Amino acid sequence: MSTDLHWQTQGQGPDLVLLHGWGMNGAVWQQVVERLELHFRLHVVDLPGYGHSAHLHAASLEEIAQQLLEHAPKQAIWVGWSLGGLVATHMALHHADYVSKLVTVASSPKFAAEARWRGIQPQVLSAFTEQLSEDFHTTVERFMALQAMGSPSARQDVKNLKQAVFSRPQPNPQSLLAGLQMLAEVDLRDHLPHLTMPMLRLYGRLDGLVPIKVAQDLEKVLPASEQFIFTQSSHAPFITEPESFCHQLLSFAGK
């Protein structure tokens, strides 16, 4: 069995890496891959523990990074969704020669809420952790529903997510647990000023996991970064508003 991560590479143009979120896999990008492959050489990865990389595992952001480094293109645009945004930001901070531009999608440097920081309530994350040990298939489905909640096309969004995710092998429970732990514990806020490359932050106005207040707070920390808010989207704007999403990436890449 391969010890390498599963990478899917297609298209022509500048290198662009797509990283999925917790409980998902690279198939979630399929809708936008069809549009973006005309403009970029795309590198879609299944992170350790997910999809075709389900037999692998990584317990921290740096362990994930080390596995990515084995086949990642240098000087690429990195696009990370949700937990994938934490991974992409970690790559940009610690392996900057691989990242020419950074794009985070519905992501936060700290997902768990605390006193003056908006985010996912810690009890929600601990409930997911408990449910995971009982029935991880249902837990992942619940998380999909939570991601789409609020979007006018929520039902269709969930259907698209399910179709994509269940088209590949199921994630391994150990990696799901490690991912939840990262969402609960990682805090990159103090490291963000060290980012040197251009950055674009994309958000869904209706997102219940990464509240729009996070976008405003990060504007102060990252004054040189750009941001865009998708008005009709919740946590998965590339599924709800794929054309607008691709437009944002193309515009940012061309700068």
Swiss-Prot record:
PANTHER family listed in its UniProt record: AB HYDROLASE SUPERFAMILY PROTEIN YCLE, MONOACYLGLYCEROL LIPASE
EC number: 3.1.1.85
Subunit note: Monomer.
Gene: bioH
HAMAP family: Carboxylester
Molecular-function GO terms, alphabetical: pimelyl-[acyl-carrier protein] methyl ester esterase activity
Gene3D superfamilies: alpha/beta hydrolase (3.40.50.1820)
Catalysed transformations (reactions): 6-carboxyhexanoyl-[ACP] methyl ester + H2O = 6-carboxyhexanoyl-[ACP] + methanol + H(+)
Pfam family, one: Abhydrolase_1
Annotated GO CC locations: cytoplasm; membrane
Family: Belongs to the AB hydrolase superfamily. Carboxylesterase BioH family.
Name used for this protein in its record: Pimeloyl-[acyl-carrier protein] methyl ester esterase
Domain AB hydrolase-1: 16-242
Highest classification ranks of the organism: Bacteria, Pseudomonadati, Pseudomonadota, Gammaproteobacteria, Vibrionales
Primary residence: cytoplasm
UniProt-annotated catalytic positions: 82 (nucleophile), 207, 235
